[in-house]
A protein has these predicted regions:
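Juxtamembrane helix-break-helix junctions at the cytosolic face
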Residues: 75-77
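Short glycine- and Lys/Arg-enriched binding-loop motifs that mark or flank ligand-binding interfaces
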Residues: 35, 85, 92
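Juxtamembrane non-transmembrane "cap" segments at the membrane-aqueous interface
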Residues: 88-111
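Alpha-helical transmembrane segments and their membrane-interface boundaries
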Residues: 1-69, 80-82, 105-146
Length: 146
């Protein structure tokens, strides 16, 4: 029960973030609810996959593929381009923590000099961020190919 409650709360915050970015990207008003719904869906799905011990990359890919399929349906139904839904929806799953960790480690390398631990941390965080971005890209692109 605790996991379900936390999932609902996190989904609501993800929907709020997607809604905000939808407003920033100036999407049509009638699509804002779908952007928010997409953000909640994609974040909740990724959290569920992570809970079942999928890796972050696979979880992100699967969640992105699902929102890609849903956005493809919405775009055909409402005659709105697919990126209107997908761009705002994927905002909650962007790898900000890993990118931030890579950049702060890079600053530490510049400030204190290179050490094995810092280089390892930079490489790990940077490659993890790139892998998650690639997973998002393929997850969004593959549904539109069929």
């Amino acid at each position: 029960m605790n996991f379900l409650l936390q999932l609902i709360i996190d989904g609501a915050f993800a929907a709020t973030a997607s809604l905000g970015f939808g407003m920033v990207f100036n999407v049509p008003k009638h699509t804002l609810k779908y952007c928010a719904m997409g953000g909640a869906i994609v974040y909740s799905l990724r959290t569920i996959f992570l809970h079942f011990n999928f890796g972050i990359e696979i979880s992100t890919f699967l969640a992105s593929a699902v929102i890609g399929i849903i956005a493809l349906y919405w775009s055909r139904k409402y005659k709105i381009p697919r990126p209107v839904y997908t761009v705002a929806s994927i905002i909650p799953i962007l790898p900000g923590t890993y990118a931030f960790g890579a950049m702060t480690t890079l600053i530490d390398i510049n400030r204190f000099g290179a050490s094995i631990e810092l280089i390892e941390s930079f490489t790990h965080n940077g490659l993890k961020a790139i892998a998650v971005l690639i997973a998002i890209t393929f997850g969004l692109v593959l549904p539109s190919l069929y």
